Amino acid sequence: MAEASEFNFNLRRKSRAVTASRRVKEEVKEKQKMDDSKSQVVDVDSVSVYSHESSRSNYSDAYEKLKREPVVEESNDARYRTFEFSEDEETFKPANKMSDKSQRNSKSKHTEGLECSDTVLEKISELTLEIEKVKQMNQPITVDAAFNMTLRNVDNLTTRQKQALVNSIINSMN
């Protein structure tokens, strides 16, 4: 109902005056139904002056009027967003509205920011791919290649690591 201020409620006032003059009539009908236990049932039906058909047509007419109204580009929400509430005066003041040019500039800056982040993400993915390639190149392909690489790098191992390496080689031969 944020956009309720756009509607004309004069029709509703007229219908209130008409309905105030008319009274709702109530008819009580007693129906007797015979059940297996042969009990009596009393039904109360309330019937209004208006028929069901006419109330439907009123709604359909109102709906058609709403459909014929021109489409408003700017809703009430967008209109009232340009006002700021002043606490000291308890009123609404018009806010500084950005011009179309500044809005376009801010949108273009936003898209440039997205493009920059896209390029950064692309570079990061390329570098990650290169790191994976280097890791694969350093990984031994076969057991013999791993053995030869280990022997080449024996000088970098500590004494305990060398002892563990010799023990593992001896155990693998058994």
Curated annotation (Swiss-Prot):
What domain of life is recorded for the organism?
Answer: Viruses
GO CC terms, sorted: host cell cytoplasm
Q: Name one GO molecular function term.
A: RNA binding
Q: What is its main location?
A: host cell
* Coiled-coil residue windows: none
Post-translational modifications reported in the UniProt record: O-glycosylated.
Q: Which UniProt keywords apply?
A: Glycoprotein, Host cytoplasm, Nucleotide-binding, RNA-binding
Q: Where in the cell is it found?
A: Host cytoplasm
Q: Name one Pfam family in it.
A: GBR_NSP5
Basic and acidic residues: compositionally biased ranges: 23-38, 98-113
Query: According to the UniProt record, where is the region Disordered?
Result: 18-40, 86-114
One GO biological process term is: viral genome replication
HAMAP family under this entry?
A: ROTA_NSP5
The record describes the protein's role as: Plays an essential role in the viral genome replication. Participates, together with NSP2, in the formation of viral factories (viroplasms) which are large inclusions in the host cytoplasm where replication intermediates are assembled and viral RNA replication takes place. Orchestrates the recruitment of viroplasmic proteins such as capsid proteins to these factories.
Concerning its family, UniProt says: Belongs to the rotavirus NSP5 family.
Subunit field text: Homodimer. Interacts with VP1. Interacts with VP2. Interacts with NSP2 and NSP6.
UniProt protein name: Non-structural protein 5
Q: What is the lineage of its organism?
A: Viruses, Riboviria, Orthornavirae, Duplornaviricota, Resentoviricetes
